[in-house]
UniProtKB/Swiss-Prot annotation:
Cellular compartments annotated: Cytoplasm
Function: Catalyzes the GTP-dependent ribosomal translocation step during translation elongation. During this step, the ribosome changes from the pre-translocational (PRE) to the post-translocational (POST) state as the newly formed A-site-bound peptidyl-tRNA and P-site-bound deacylated tRNA move to the P and E sites, respectively. Catalyzes the coordinated movement of the two tRNA molecules, the mRNA and conformational changes in the ribosome.
Gene field: fusA
Descriptive protein name: Elongation factor G
Binding residues annotated for GTP, in chain numbering: 17-24, 81-85, 135-138
C-alpha cells in the first residue's frame, strides 16, 4: 500500500511539562488548528479531547499518555500528550522512549519547576531532540526572557529564542518571528485572523539584538555557516531555518517559542516549528537491538526493512485489550502473525487502529515510523518487542522506576475478591510501575505505586471500571533490602520419610550487583556436579526468596549470585528439593553479607514566603531531611532537600498550618538510601514475622 505521507514528512512528537504549564490546552489547540476537532475543549471544563479517562476529566490533569494523529502542511504529526504529575512518571518515560522529538511546555510565570527537570532528564536519557514553548504569556507576571534564562541555567540547555512576544500579560497582541523577521498580529479571539507585518518600530532594537544572537548560535551548528557568518555577519532566512533544524537534530540547539494556548496565540507557529525543526524518523539514529546470537544490530526506518516495533503501552478497552506500538521498521499487516521476541511467543494481529483520542480509525497496515494500536495481542506487555519471526530482534526496552509506596486492599465480599483479581491483572498489564503482592503474614493483597495520587487513581479505577468494593489501608513505605558485603552460602535440603526421599544441595557465592540490576544469577556449575535440570529450580528458589526478602520481608535488590557447587542424589533429588535448597543457600549467604534496609529518598522542593523560611528548614531537618539548597526570588524562598518518604506523610497539611496556607511543595522519588541503624532495627523487629 502506498504511503499517505513519505517518512521525511512524518513527525512523532510528545508534549511534556510540569503540572499546570498548559500542556493539554496546547495539545487541544493543535488539534483545533489542524482540523482534528472543530470545537475548542478546555481542561478546566473537563472537555479536553486527550483527557478521556473519567478521573482525568474530573481532576483536570492528564494521567495517561494519549496518542493522537493529525496533519499540518502536508506532514503527518503523531502527538503524545503526557502527564506532568510526578506520580505518572512512567507515562512520560514510555512516551520519551518512542518519540523522535518533544515540545517542552513551560509556564511564563512559574518557569522551570522541579518536574520540568525530571521531564528534561527523561528526554536526555533517550536523546530526544526538543523545542520549548513558553506558554501563558497572557498571565500576570509572565516573563519570557526570565524563563529563557532559567532553561539555560537550570537545565543546562543551549536555548535560543526564535520568537519574541509583542506585549505581555493582558497586552499580549502578537509574536515576532525572529527567523523571518516579521510580526504576527492576532486580530480575533480564536487566533485565526492573523496579520503578518513588519516589526513594530518600538521593538526594532530588541529584535535586532536577539536576531544577531540567533544567527551566532545557529552558525555554531555548521562549519559552512560559521564561515559565512564570520565573513558577512549575516545568514539568510533559509540558512537560519536549515541551521536550526541541524542543531535540533544533533542536540546542539533548543529553539524557544512563546505564546498563550488558552488565548489562541502562537499555536500555529508551534506547528510550523514542529514541521520545520523537529526530526522525522529517518533523521534520528536507527533503533538498536540484540539478535538471538547476542550480537548488536540496527533496524533502519524503512518499510522494506524487516518488521520491528515496540509495545509501549497496554490499555484495557471496552472492545478488548489495546496495545500501543511504535513502528520502527517494516510493515505490520492486519491478520498476520508476528513474534514477541521478548517472551519468545507468536502473536496474531487481529485489528489495527490509529487513534484520535477516544475516537479510532481502523487501518489495514502500519508502516515504519507510525504510532498505532493493535487489538488481539494476548501476552504482550509494556516494553516487549514485536518483530518478524524470520528475522527476530529484541529492541532496547523501557526504564521502569521502582514503586515507593503501598497500600493494603481488602475486598468486602467473595464476589469482590474475584473482581479484584481481574482488576489487578488488568491494571498491572497497563502500568509497569503498579505492583501487586500478597503479604505472607496477613494474607492481604498489597498494591504498590509511585505516590499517593497514583494509588488513589488506581483504587478509584478499580471501583469505577471493575466495580470492586474494598477497604483500603493506610499508605506504607516500600522499603528494599540489599547487601553491602560478599560471602558464600550453602543450602542442603534432605528429608527421609519412608519411600522416596528429598535431596538437594546448593552452594553459592553472593556479591553486591550493579545499581538497578535487581537479581542477577550466574551458573558456574561445571562437570555436571549438579545436573542441568536442577539449575533452573535452584535459581527460581533464590529469585522467590529475593522477592520476599530475608531480613524484614521487603524485596532484595541489586544482588549477584553465582551457583558454584552442590550435589545431588540419583533417586531422591527433585526440582522441588533444589528449589528449597536454593532458597536456603540464598538466605544463608544474605545473612553473612552485611544486609541493610533501604528507604526511598524524595527530592522535595518547597516554596514559601521569606518569613517562614526558618520554620520550614527546621521542620525538614526534624524529618531527617538534608537541605541541599535555598534561593530567594522576589520575597519567595525556594528550598530543595532530600527527605525520607517515611517522614513525608501528612506534610501538605503541616506545611499549610506552618505557613498560613501560603506554602507549596512538590515531591518526587530520588533514590534509595540506607536506613539509619536505630530506625532500621524498629522496622525489622516490626516486620520480622514476614521474613
Amino acid at each position: 500500500m502506498a504511503r499517505a505521507f513519505p517518512l521525511e514528512r512524518v513527525r512523532n512528537i510528545g508534549i511534556a511539562a510540569h503540572i499546570d504549564a498548559g500542556k493539554t490546552t496546547t495539545t487541544e489547540r493543535i488539534l483545533f488548528y489542524s482540523g482534528v476537532v472543530h470545537k475548542i475543549g478546555e481542561v478546566h471544563d473537563g472537555a479536553a479531547v486527550t483527557d478521556w479517562m473519567a478521573q482525568e476529566r474530573e481532576r483536570g490533569i492528564t494521567i495517561t499518555a494519549a496518542a493522537i494523529s493529525t496533519s499540518w502542511k502536508d506532514h503527518r504529526v503523531n502527538i503524545i500528550d503526557t502527564p506532568g504529575h510526578v506520580d505518572f512518571t512512567i507515562e512520560v518515560e514510555r512516551s520519551m522512549r518512542v518519540l523522535d522529538g518533544v515540545i517542552a511546555v513551560f509556564c511564563a510565570v512559574g518557569g522551570v519547576q522541579p518536574q520540568s527537570e525530571t521531564v528534561w532528564r527523561q528526554a536526555d536519557r533517550y536523546s530526544v531532540p526538543r523545542m520549548v514553548f513558553v506558554n501563558k504569556m497572557d498571565r500576570t507576571g509572565a516573563d519570557f526572557l526570565k524563563v529563557h534564562g532559567q532553561i539555560q541555567d537550570r537545565l543546562k540547555a543551549n536555548a535560543v529564542p526564535i520568537q519574541l512576544p509583542i506585549g505581555a500579560e493582558g497586552e499580549l497582541s502578537g509574536i515576532i518571528d525572529l527567523v523571518e523577521n516579521k510580526a504576527h498580529i492576532y486580530k480575533d479571539d480564536l487566533g485565526q485572523d492573523i496579520e503578518i507585518t513588519d516589526v513594530p518600530e518600538a521593538m526594532k532594537d530588541q529584535v535586532e539584538e536577539w536576531r544577531a544572537f540567533l544567527m551566532e548560535k545557529v552558525a555554531e551548528t555548521d562549519e559552512a555557516l560559521i564561515e559565512k557568518f564570520l565573513d558577512t555577519g549575516e545568514l539568510s532566512n533559509d540558512e537560519l531555518k536549515q541551521g536550526i533544524r541541524t542543531g535540533v537534530v544533533k542536540h546542539g540547539l533548543v529553539p524557544v517559542l512563546c505564546g498563550s494556548a488558552f488565548k489562541n496565540k502562537g499555536v500555529q507557529l508551534v506547528l510550523d516549528a514542529v514541521v520545520d525543526y523537529l526530526p522525522a524518523p529517518i533523521d534520528v539514529p536507527p533503533i538498536q537491538g540484540i539478535l538471538p546470537d547476542g550480537t548488536e544490530a540496527v533496524r533502519p526506518s524503512d518499510d522494506k526493512a524487516p518488521f520491528s516495533a515496540l509495545a509501549f503501552k497496554v490499555m484495557a478497552d471496552p472492545y478488548g485489550k489495546l496495545t500501543f506500538v511504535r513502528m520502527y521498521s517494516g510493515v505490520l499487516e492486519k491478520g498476520s502473525y508476528v513474534m514477541n521476541s521478548t517472551k519468545g511467543i507468536k502473536e496474531r494481529i487481529s485489528r489495527l487502529v490509529v487513534l484520535k483520542a477516544d475516537d479510532r480509525e481502523e487501518v489495514d497496515q502500519l508502516q515504519a515510523g507510525d504510532l498505532g494500536a493493535v487489538l488481539g495481542l494476548k501476552n504482550t506487555t509494556t516494553g516487549d518487542t514485536l518483530c518478524s519471526a524470520d528475522e527476530p530482534i529484541v529492541l532496547e526496552t523501557l526504564f521502569v522506576p521502582e514503586p515507593v509506596i503501598s497500600v493494603a486492599v481488602e475486598p468486602k465480599t467473595k464476589g469482590d475478591m474475584e473482581k479484584l483479581s481481574k482488576a489487578l491483572v488488568s491494571l498491572a498489564e497497563e502500568d509497569p510501575t503498579f505492583r501487586v503482592r500478597t503479604d505472607q503474614e496477613t494474607g492481604q493483597t498489597v498494591i504498590a505505586g509511585m505516590g499517593e495520587l497514583h494509588l488513589e487513581i488506581l483504587v478509584d479505577r478499580m471501583m469505577r471500571e471493575f466495580k470492586v468494593e474494598a477497604n483500603i489501608g493506610a499508605p506504607q513505605v516500600s522499603y528494599r533490602e540489599t547487601i553491602r558485603g560478599s560471602s558464600k552460602g550453602e543450602g542442603k535440603f534432605s528429608r527421609q520419610t519412608g519411600g522416596k526421599g528429598q535431596y538437594g544441595h546448593v552452594v553459592i557465592e553472593m556479591e553486591p550487583g550493579e545499581p538497578e540490576s535487581g537479581f542477577v544469577f550466574v551458573n558456574k556449575i561445571v562437570g555436571g556436579i549438579v545436573p542441568k535440570e536442577f539449575i533452573k529450580p535452584s535459581e527460581q528458589g533464590m529469585k522467590e526468596t529475593c522477592e520476599s526478602g530475608v531480613i524484614a520481608g521487603f524485596p532484595l535488590i541489586d544482588v549477584k549470585v553465582s551457583m558454584v557447587d552442590g550435589s545431588y542424589h540419583d533417586v531422591d533429588s527433585s526440582e522441588m528439593a533444589f528449589k528449597i535448597a536454593g532458597s536456603m543457600a540464598f538466605k544463608d549467604a544474605v545473612r553473612k553479607c552485611n544486609p541493610v534496609l533501604l528507604e526511598p529518598m524524595m527530592k522535595v522542593e518547597v516554596e514559601v514566603p521569606e518569613d517562614f523560611l526558618g520554620s520550614v528548614i527546621g521542620d525538614l531537618s526534624s524529618r531527617r531531611g538534608q537541605v541541599e539548597g535555598q534561593a530567594i526570588d522576589d520575597g519567595t524562598s525556594k528550598v530543595s532537600a532530600k527527605v525520607p518518604l517515611a517522614e513525608m506523610f501528612g506534610y501538605a497539611t503541616e506545611l499549610r498550618s506552618m505557613t498560613q496556607g501560603r506554602g507549596i511543595f512538590s515531591m518526587e522519588f530520588s533514590h534509595y538510601e540506607d536506613v539509619p541503624r536505630n530506625v532500621a532495627e524498629a522496622i525489622i523487629s516490626k516486620n520480622q514475622g514476614n521474613s
